[in-house]
Amino acid sequence: MAGRGKAIGAGAAKKATSRSSKAGLQFPVGRIARFLKAGKYAERVGAGAPVYLAAVLEYLAAEVLELAGNAARDNKKTRIVPRHIQLAVRNDEELTKLLGGATIASGGVMPNIHQHLLPKKAGSSKASTVDDDDN
């Protein structure tokens, strides 16, 4: 009965590989799977669901951090603070739609001056006075 059972003198057991590294992700697939099971979102959780969810969360985090890093660089800062995350999210149309109801602590408000409060354009008033003089 060759090929059955453990071979004598077999090498050491294969080193365990995490599901995150198998999927090429940084986010923890095992932890997300545990949360999905403990949360009772469904009776059973498929094997691919936590991998997919981890990939989606990692993509969203990378997107927000990239935009926040750009906002920090625009403000000549080397550290991302909540204000930079707020500016990044609110200046992106899709992220604003996704996180519209979320409040970012210490994020501040978006700079906005109502059009009626802005000073009138000097060039447009000169053009109208020149036209009046010609008539």
From Swiss-Prot:
CDD domains: HFD_H2A
Locations listed in the record: Nucleus; Chromosome
Pfam families assigned to the protein according to its UniProt record, in alphabetical order: Histone, Histone_H2A_C
Molecular function GO labels: DNA binding; protein heterodimerization activity; structural constituent of chromatin
Protein name: Probable histone H2A.1
Keywords: Chromosome, DNA-binding, Nucleosome core, Nucleus
Subunit structure: The nucleosome is a histone octamer containing two molecules each of H2A, H2B, H3 and H4 assembled in one H3-H4 heterotetramer and two H2A-H2B heterodimers. The octamer wraps approximately 147 bp of DNA.
GO BP terms in the entry: heterochromatin formation
UniProt KW rRNA-binding keyword: no
Stretches that traverse the bilayer: none
Similarity field: Belongs to the histone H2A family.
Functional description taken from the UniProt entry: Core component of nucleosome. Nucleosomes wrap and compact DNA into chromatin, limiting DNA accessibility to the cellular machineries which require DNA as a template. Histones thereby play a central role in transcription regulation, DNA repair, DNA replication and chromosomal stability. DNA accessibility is regulated via a complex set of post-translational modifications of histones, also called histone code, and nucleosome remodeling.
Superkingdom of the organism of origin: Eukaryota
Upper classification of the organism: Eukaryota, Viridiplantae, Streptophyta, Embryophyta, Tracheophyta
